[in-house]
Design a protein with these regions (language model features):
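Acidic/His- and Gly-rich active-site-bordering loop/insert found
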Residues: 3-98
Length: 98
């Protein structure tokens, strides 16, 4: 069942924050971060870590040797109910310089 109120609230939030969201995406996609480019992937991770922490998220970086570090974030650690897991990646398929 669709919660129309949640959809309306989410759409309104996106509309209010569109410019800052686009600015963040532009910053992230401007970083060369191909899979073998550990330094670039780690730079993307640092940007995301700062963003998450500014939103009150508890973060941790798990160092990796060959590829980009892993980044975890926990919201509302003490909240009741089942947790929700979001997973993503910070690398791209593009070679450095392309």
């Amino acid at each position: 069942m669709e919660d129309r109120g949640l959809i309306v609230k989410t759409s309104a939030y996106i509309d209010r924050h569109r410019d800052e969201m686009l600015s963040l995406w532009e910053k992230i996609v401007s970083i060369e971060s191909g899979t073998p480019d550990k330094e670039g992937v780690d730079r993307v991770g640092a940007v995301l870590k700062d963003e998450l922490e500014s939103a009150g998220v508890e973060t941790a970086v798990i160092p990796m040797e060959r590829f980009g570090n892993l980044l975890t974030g926990v919201w509302n650690k003490e909240a009741a109910g089942q947790p929700i897991v979001l997973i993503g990646h910070m690398d791209t398929v593009f070679a450095k310089g392309t």
